[in-house]
């Protein structure tokens, strides 16, 4: 039934003819004046009329589709030719305000498929820019968009500058996941690239010859994030930071709220109780002051203290892949 369309009443004289659209006989048919028909309307007794089998051709040909749309609009402005089965899906997309090369799509476990010839990423290609995300959905996939000339720009970049960029923590070792949440990172500390990435940079020919390339997206998950400045002894916390799944660091330059010291990356941890490892617990004593239902509303925050609203509805976090 995808090849047919039902309209609330007939298109042609007698509400029963099956004259194909576009034939010369169509112009000769005239519908009777509605004022002359004093009886009950025919379309109330008949559920609808099936457009002939040549109707799908009007969906392919733009001229014929416009002709069919004009015919339907003359009968009822609210009618539109629905000749194809709707197979669409609503997705939320947010583009980076600075560089629109990273797009965040709320597709859940599914990701946005790319039909372009540059699905994979070259080992020498620079890392994508930061994106903007909000805690609206649980898991999201990332897909990158390229511009014309990006390949030339990536070739023009020198090697040391590329190595100085923060590496994406997609393939972290198990040591990072088991680190103590109380251990904090120095402001100038950077992570070294993993051996797999180093090997792929040293042997670009083997990586290009592999039929299966590494996907250019990574899943994100919300975790509890906190900041600690050792210079001014200031600690402030925030929650539901979107980081790469399986890691505990977010690559976004953060400034201290007191001394404006910058450090990157900052550490995050799971949004759960450190005593019983549950999202909702009833432990009499907690290691930190945090409401697990509203982890951003706490004394150490300062952004939403003594406020009537929850910060979980008004803020978003950035990350660098």
UniProtKB/Swiss-Prot annotation:
Subunit structure: Interacts with YBX2.
Key words of the record: Cytoplasm, Developmental protein, Differentiation, Metal-binding, Oogenesis, RNA-binding, Zinc, Zinc-finger
Identification of the protein by name: Protein ZAR1-like
Gene Ontology cellular component annotations, sorted alphabetically: cytoplasm; cytoplasmic ribonucleoprotein granule; intracellular membraneless organelle
Main localization (coarse): cytoplasm
Top-level lineage group: Eukaryota
Residues spanning the membrane: none
Biased composition regions of type Basic and acidic residues, renumbered to the chain: 145-154
Compartment(s): Cytoplasm, Cytoplasmic ribonucleoprotein granule
Pfam short name (any one): Zn_ribbon_3CxxC
GO biological process annotation, one example: oocyte maturation
Organism name: Homo sapiens (Human)
3CxxC-type zinc-finger residues: 222-307
Membership in a protein family: Belongs to the ZAR1 family.
GO MF, one annotated term: zinc ion binding
Reported function: mRNA-binding protein required for maternal mRNA storage, translation and degradation during oocyte maturation. Probably promotes formation of some phase-separated membraneless compartment that stores maternal mRNAs in oocytes: acts by undergoing liquid-liquid phase separation upon binding to maternal mRNAs. Binds to the 3'-UTR of maternal mRNAs, inhibiting their translation.
Location of region: Disordered: 110-214
Domain description: Disordered region at the N-terminus undergoes liquid-liquid phase separation (LLPS) for the formation of membraneless compartments that store maternal mRNAs in oocytes. The 3CxxC-type mediates binding to the 3'-UTR of mRNAs.
């Amino acid at each position: 039934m995808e090849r047919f369309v039902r309209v609330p009443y007939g298109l042609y004289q007698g509400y029963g003819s099956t004259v194909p659209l576009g034939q010369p006989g169509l112009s000769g048919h005239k519908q009777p004046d509605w004022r002359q028909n004093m009886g009950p309307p025919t379309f109330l007794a008949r559920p609808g009329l099936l457009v002939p089998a040549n109707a799908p051709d009007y969906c392919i040909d733009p001229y014929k589709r416009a002709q069919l749309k004009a015919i339907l609009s003359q009968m009822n402005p609210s009618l539109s030719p629905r000749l194809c089965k709707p197979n669409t899906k609503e997705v939320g997309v947010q583009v980076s305000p600075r560089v629109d090369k990273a797009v965040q799509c709320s597709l859940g476990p599914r990701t946005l498929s790319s039909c372009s010839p540059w699905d994979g990423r070259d080992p020498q290609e620079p890392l994508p820019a930061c994106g903007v995300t909000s805690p609206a959905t649980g898991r999201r996939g990332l897909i990158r968009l390229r511009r014309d000339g990006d390949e030339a720009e990536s070739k023009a970049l020198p090697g040391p500058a590329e190595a100085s960029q923060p590496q994406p923590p997609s393939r972290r070792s198990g040591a990072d996941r088991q680190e103590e949440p109380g251990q904090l990172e120095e402001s100038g500390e950077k992570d070294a690239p993993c051996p797999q990435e180093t090997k792929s940079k040293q042997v670009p020919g083997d990586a290009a010859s592999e039929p299966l390339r590494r996907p250019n997206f990574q899943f994100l998950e919300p975790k509890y994030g906190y900041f600690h400045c050792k210079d001014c002894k200031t600690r402030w916390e925030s929650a539901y930071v979107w980081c790469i799944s399986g890691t505990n660091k977010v690559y976004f330059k953060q400034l201290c709220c007191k001394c404006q010291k910058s450090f990157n990356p900052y550490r995050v941890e799971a949004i759960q109780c450190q005593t019983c490892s549950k999202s909702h617990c009833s432990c009499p004593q907690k290691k930190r002051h945090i409401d697990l239902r509203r982890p951003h509303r706490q004394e150490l925050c300062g952004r939403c203290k003594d406020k009537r609203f929850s910060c979980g509805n008004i803020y978003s976090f950035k990350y660098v892949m």
